[in-house]
Amino acid sequence: KLDTTFLFEIPLFRKLNNIEEQNNWFSASDKPALSNYLSSELKTLNNEAVVSNYKFGKVNETGFLDTKKLKENYTNYLVAENCYLEETFDYSKLVIQDDQIEYKDIRAKQIVFAEGFGLHNNPYFNNLPLDGTKGELLIIKSENLKLNEIINSSIWILPLGNHLYKVGATYDWEDKTNQTTEKAKTELVEKAAKAQELA
């Protein structure tokens, strides 16, 4: 229906930092629930910009979802179908019945709340012992990195093309704002420099 691609297959390699991590990788890859997803053969990454004293574990069936592109295209589709409403949800207007829910003039069988850490404001879920975390990422440019795969270490690095890479992510349990921070930028730059030599 949307006539475009959002899911891109790309290999993911987990940087293993010592013998113990390699042994843990072998143990995990032998488990029946994980064996289809974790390669039992460790890989060498032939990339001078990525320094590692040990091999990498390859995760199978990996890629990334371009969520921004998906959201934009799907929103446009729903608008064209007259099925999209953008407003602040008013919980007091939600009526739950045995066989349906009603919200203003909308009737449906089910409702899905996709609110992230906003669930604390949702009267149906604010009693759950869940706490949101804020994650930040950077887009960097590196002509020397030349990655065609995702690298996962203390951070992850995702190639975007044209020498651009997404680097992430931070985890902040205190700051719940939508604003980027210099603290997160510094953390990501330092981890990127330590985990990989980005020339």
Describe the role of every protein-language-model region.
Residues R14-L16, K58, I139-K141:
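Short, well-ordered beta-strand micro-motif
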Residues V50-F56:
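A short, surface-exposed helix-loop junction/capping segment
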Residues K1-E48:
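Dinucleotide-binding Rossmann-like beta1-alpha1 core, especially the glycine-rich loop
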